[in-house]
């Protein structure tokens, strides 16, 4: 059962006093705006980071500055796509103008960003994937790290019921299914686009080059501790 916000901040402060951590990783699948606000008002006593959704709160300069003062070193953000139509069809609830404003506000506040983008989803095409490239190029100065992933179709998902699916191999017991992309934007084409177009762009390459081998999102905030 989730902790109430006040209890969460009190326990974080108690643990920080007891353990004297260099960095706190908040493991919520998505830190709520209410908890973000509480962390800004009642800092845990050590730098912290975690995953959160793009909301209007993050598009506010003053709110982001308060997060920084409260110890926020980095936020992991699932933007997923730079094409609004794709986001809407996926039901992500993400508004790209808000995402743009949030990235700029976080940059201004001195909070690092680790941004996640997903390619090869059923509503995506190569053209809309290029919109994602355009989005990253436009916000290259506000994105510190990138995670670029190819979509895996969960076998029990609603999407799987409306797509032509198949096992990856005979006797496949995995949680995911291979599928025929409705627009022909198959995994091999997506992978080729990522490797030969997306990652080759100088703006993207510069961000990726700042990520050492075997480096994960849990190493990233250490580069931004003050």
Model region roles, listed by residue range:
Residues 57, 121-122:
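Short strand->helix junction
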Residues 127-226:
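C-terminal accessory regions of radical SAM enzymes
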Residues 18-19, 70, 101-113, 139-142, ...:
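A structural motif corresponding to the C-terminal end of an alpha-helix
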Residues 36-45, 107-108, 125-143:
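Short, electropositive alpha-helical surface patch
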Residues 27-33, 120, 148-158:
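Short, solvent-exposed turn/loop segments enriched in Gly/Ser/Thr/Pro and often Arg
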Residues 1-112:
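Radical SAM [4Fe-4S] cluster-binding motif and immediate context
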Residues 67, 77, 115, 136, ...:
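Hydrophobic, well-ordered secondary-structure elements that form the walls
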Residues 22-24, 114, 143-148:
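Acidic/polar loop patches that form or flank catalytic/metal-binding clefts of enzymes
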């Amino acid at each position: 059962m989730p902790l109430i916000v006040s209890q969460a901040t009190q326990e974080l402060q108690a643990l920080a006093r007891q353990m004297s951590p260099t960095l706190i990783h908040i493991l919520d699948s998505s830190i709520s705006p209410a908890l973000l606000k509480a962390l800004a008002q009642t800092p845990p006593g050590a730098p912290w980071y975690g995953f959160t959704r793009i909301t209007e709160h993050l598009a506010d300069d003053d709110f982001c500055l308060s997060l920084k003062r409260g110890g926020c070193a980095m936020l992991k953000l699932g933007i997923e796509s730079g094409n609004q139509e794709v986001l809407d069809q996926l039901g992500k609830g993400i508004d790209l103008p808000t995402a743009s404003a949030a990235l700029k506000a976080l940059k201004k506040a001195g909070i690092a960003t680790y941004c996640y983008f997903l390619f090869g989803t059923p509503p995506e095409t190569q053209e809309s994937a290029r919109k994602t490239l355009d989005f990253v190029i436009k916000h290259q100065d506000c994105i510190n790290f990138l995670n670029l992933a190819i979509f895996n179709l969960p076998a029990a998902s609603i999407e799987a019921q409306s797509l032509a699916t198949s096992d990856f191999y005979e006797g496949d017991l995995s949680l995911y299914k291979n599928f025929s992309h409705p627009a022909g934007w198959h995994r091999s084409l997506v992978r080729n686009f990522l490797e030969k177009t997306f990652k080759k762009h100088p703006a993207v390459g510069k961000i990726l080059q700042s990520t050492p081998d075997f480096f994960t999102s849990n190493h990233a905030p250490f580069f931004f501790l003050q």
